[in-house]
Structure formats: structure tokens, C-alpha cells
Amino acid sequence: MLKLENISFKVGVDGSDLEIIDNISLEISDGSFTVITGPNGGGKSTLARLIMGIEKPTEGRILFNGEDITSLSVTERAKKGIGYAFQQPPRFKGLTVRRLLSLAAGSELPEDECCGYLTSVGLCSKDYLNREMDTSLSGGEAKRIEIATLMARKLNLAIFDEPEAGIDLWSFSMLVESFKAMCSGSHESAIV
């Protein structure tokens, strides 16, 4: 379970503090699918970065499975089973999609399992398994592959920051169903 207690986040701008997030509390149960909505610049991505540990709150606590993780690093949170998909996925020249999925899973994945992850995000696995994760991929393709890597990790908490970026509406509807299936009947939670 993820619990945010009175989380605030401020940044210094021209000698004064700009409040990005003000006193947010929320609880996300194991196995839940949670969507956070709001206007552009409303703090959604900042909240995701706070949960992942990329940013630290100026006030409040973040608890994960009863443990205070507020001061833990990104790496320490990842070891606890928290994963994050960026708005702009990274590219890895020389690394194939299949190898990336295996790295995410922590061991060499059989081809059929890799294909299953790619299919669940709307990609034809035969077209992508041996492709490199480089700039030849469109933004939407890279985003889907990054989502598939989080699915392969079998996380306790997966955070998807603007997963719709670069993805058409029909495909995103299918991704939402994949997110729900990921959480259904498991302890894995997803925040979109």
C-alpha cells in the first residue's frame, strides 16, 4: 500500500518559493488502478516524481507497505518494487527490445513471454523483438516498449507518467485495459 501524508513540494523562483503541490494526502491500496487527472502544469508529473524519489517533498511523508520511504533514493525504491515510466522514454543504441525486456525482468525471458508483453501494449512482436531501442523508433513506439518493460518487471507499484503521450486514442484505450489487467488479481498497483 502507498500512502502519502500531507505532501507538499515547493521550488525556489526568483528568491521566493513557488508551491507546486500543497498538502496532498492519499492512499493507494495493493492491486488498485489509480488515475490522477488535472490540468497541464497541475503537478501530476511532480507527484509521480515525488513517489518515485526523483524529487523529495518539502513537507510530509511517503509510506510504502508501512515503511517510511520519504528519504530513500530512486534506486532504493526500485529495489522495493516501485517502477516509473517517463514522459519521454530513454533510448538505448545497441540494445534490442528483447534484451531490454529481459533486463527489466532480471533474467533472460523466453521469446513467447517477450511477445506477450509487446502484444499487451499493442505492438506486433515480430516487428519489434530484434529492433534496437534507438532513435529509429517513434515516440509512441518507445513509450509502449517502456510500458512493456514495467510489466515485465512485475512491480509492486508501477507509475506511468503521461502514458498517452505519442499514442493514439484507440491504442491508449487498449493500454488502459492492459493496466487494469496488470492489477487484477495481484498485489501490483498502477498509477497513471
Language-model features, listed with the residues they occupy:
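The feature captures the beta-strand-to-loop junction immediately N-terminal to the Walker
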Residues: 37-39
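Conserved ABC transporter NBD signature motif
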Residues: 60-67, 80, 113
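Q-loop/switch helix immediately C-terminal to the Walker
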Residues: 88, 94-113
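ABC ATPase C-loop
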Residues: 150-151
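Walker B catalytic motif
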Residues: 162-163, 170
